């Protein structure tokens, strides 16, 4: 009985650490996507000020 309880406790700790790691990783991915969008918007805005060609700026900035 005691070993079953210890095994269950260990399993819960492992699962909690996996969930914690996954949430941190998801936040990292989300922040990278946000930074990429910010970069694309900034690139597009500067390109539009220079060339005023929307089609060119979309292809240039991604």
UniProtKB/Swiss-Prot annotation:
Name of the protein in its database record: Potassium channel toxin kappa-KTx 3.2
Which GO molecular function annotations are given, in alphabetical order?
Answer: potassium channel regulator activity; toxin activity
| Family recorded in the similarity comment | Belongs to the short scorpion toxin superfamily. Potassium channel inhibitor kappa-KTx family. Kappa-KTx 3 subfamily.
Disulphide bridges, residue numbers: 43-61, 47-57
Comment on protein domains: Has the structural arrangement of two alpha-helices stabilized by disulfide bonds (CSalpha/alpha 2(S-S)).
Cleavable signal peptide: 1-26
Q: Name one GO cellular component term.
A: extracellular region
Q: Which UniProt keywords apply?
A: Disulfide bond, Ion channel impairing toxin, Neurotoxin, Potassium channel impairing toxin, Secreted, Signal, Toxin, Voltage-gated potassium channel impairing toxin
Q: Where in the cell is it found?
A: Secreted
Which residues are processed away as propeptide to yield the mature protein?
A: 27-36
Chief subcellular location: secreted
Tissue and organ expression note: Expressed by the venom gland.
- Role played: Potassium channel inhibitor (Kv).
Q: What organism is this sequence from?
A: Heterometrus petersii (Asian forest scorpion)
Q: Does the keyword Disulfide bond apply?
A: yes
């Amino acid at each position: 009985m005691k070993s079953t309880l210890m095994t269950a406790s260990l399993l819960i700790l492992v699962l909690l650490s996996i969930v914690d790691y996954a949430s941190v990783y998801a936040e990292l991915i989300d922040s990278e996507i946000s930074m990429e969008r910010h970069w694309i918007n900034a690139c597009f805005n500067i390109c539009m000020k220079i060339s005023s060609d929307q089609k060119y700026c979309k292809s240039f900035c991604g």
